Amino acid sequence: MALYCVGDIQGCDDAFERLLATIGFSPSRDTLYVLGDLVNRGPHSAAVLRRCITLGDSVRPLLGNHDLHLLAAAYGTRRPSRRDTLQDILLAPDRDEMLEWLRHQPLARRVHHGGGDLLMVHAGVLPQWTAEETLAYAGEVEAVLQSREFAGFLQQMYGNSPDLWSPELQGTDRLRVIVNALTRMRFCSPEGRMDFESTESASEAPPGLVPWFDAPGRRTLNTLIAFGHWSTLGWLDRADVLGLDTGCVWGGCLSAVRFGTTLADRERCHVECPQAQMPGA
């Protein structure tokens, strides 16, 4: 039995299929965690969702910002942008099945493997949060997304404020901070104030900002965190963090990591990808 994590697929189903073949993925034996952004910008978003649904419990995704955007567009709370490639889902005869499946996926996961814990999110974890708090706060959003009030939440989800976590936050403000941290954050201030403008690589941090994983005093420092979202960062393999978004949709590659008997025993697997989207297009 093998354990894998894969970065942002973003509708690139051909690359996803080739990656599964490259690693010899067996749904009866292996488990694959997808770190969010299954859809959008690539040409075959519906095929990615159908493949994941067909593979059953062997594929365990997280929600990313593009997945949440799909839900908002599908339920009429957000207009699709000209760069979106979601019509194959929105017009599909099995649209409702795909959307319902997606709506019931989590924003964070944790798995115990080889004597250690692996925490998985799409974008980042605020430095103030422990691993347990991250899962609990993600669960607050998941409960709303999976309730009858989900459409109202999707309508209020967007926005950059508040940009700083406080345990006293309530209602929409609280849920928005949680969503933004888990699905949008790249940089933050040393105090944990989130920035949503900068998309540079970690080595080009704007003044006063640091990559979220380098924030001083980060409370998840002793937990391995796997994440995607940050294509300009590319492949990152450190003792404490694994960055797996290697820009598949931009003509980079689709990357996965295979864990051996322990979390420290790991190797990268990847397939090259044709460019499906032009930056700024």
UniProtKB/Swiss-Prot annotation:
It is an enzyme of class 3 (hydrolase). One of its GO terms (molecular function) is bis(5'-nucleosyl)-tetraphosphatase (symmetrical) activity. It comes from the Bacteria. Hydrolyzes diadenosine 5',5'''-P1,P4-tetraphosphate to yield ADP. Belongs to the Ap4A hydrolase family. The keyword Hydrolase applies. Its EC number is 3.6.1.41. Pfam families: Metallophos (PF00149). It catalyses: P(1),P(4)-bis(5'-adenosyl) tetraphosphate + H2O = 2 ADP + 2 H(+). This is Bis(5'-nucleosyl)-tetraphosphatase, symmetrical. SUPFAM superfamilies: Metallo-dependent phosphatases. Keywords: Hydrolase.
